[in-house]
């Protein structure tokens, strides 16, 4: 939410939450009056949990069950939010497909917000290999179509009392 507030995203903006499944971003966006929200996740179970939690509010959200590594958007979004889906892509082709999807799926001047495990973060997530990033490595991947506006490193404390270091970057499409 900090990046969405930082970028002063208008309430009518088209927002997609990639890997949003059962996260609470959609709850916060709805509570703040955002009107055009899409949640994409590979897990139908996670999406069903979010729908159940939201009750009737779930009808205000577009839900997409898809693998982001092969996703081709049929529309353009003003905000593409991804907290920790991108780092699950470990193959060059998957990473390039994702970057191509952002280029195609985000409006000019649109916003790309990505959070991944940093280079100091865990090397696996839920026992699955991931790709770690730094602010510079994310910038290098996105530089052809996006300008970095803000990056921060954040220590996230898990329910298991461990700390995971993330890098969050906000980009504008150029």
Name each model-derived stretch:
Residues 84-88:
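Short catalytic micro-motifs in class I SAM-dependent methyltransferases
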Residues 1-75, 89-101, 111-174:
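Class I (Rossmann-like) S-adenosyl-L-methionine-dependent methyltransferase catalytic domain
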Residues 81:
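A conserved beta-strand element that flanks and buttresses the S-adenosyl-L-methionine
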Residues 104-107:
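Short, conserved loop/helix-junction motifs that constitute active-site signature segments
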């Amino acid at each position: 939410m900090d990046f969405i507030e930082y970028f002063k995203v208008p309430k009518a903006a088209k927002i997609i939450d990639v890997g949003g499944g059962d996260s609470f971003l959609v709850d916060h966006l709805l509570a703040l009056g955002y009107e055009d929200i899409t949640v994409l996740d590979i897990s139908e179970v996670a999406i069903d949990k979010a729908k159940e939690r939201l009750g009737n509010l779930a009808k205000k959200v577009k839900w997409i069950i898809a693998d982001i590594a092969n996703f081709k958007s049929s529309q353009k979004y003003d905000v593409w939010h991804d907290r920790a889906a991108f780092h699950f892509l470990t193959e060059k082709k998957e990473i390039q497909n994702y970057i191509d999807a952002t280029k195609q799926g985000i409006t000019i001047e649109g916003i790309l917000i990505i959070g991944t495990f940093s280079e100091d973060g865990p090397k696996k997530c839920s026992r699955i290999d991931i790709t770690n990033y730094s602010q510079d490595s994310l910038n290098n991947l996105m530089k052809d179509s996006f300008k970095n506006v803000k990056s921060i490193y954040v220590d996230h404390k898990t329910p298991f009392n461990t700390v995971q270091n993330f890098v969050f970057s906000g980009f504008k499409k150029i």
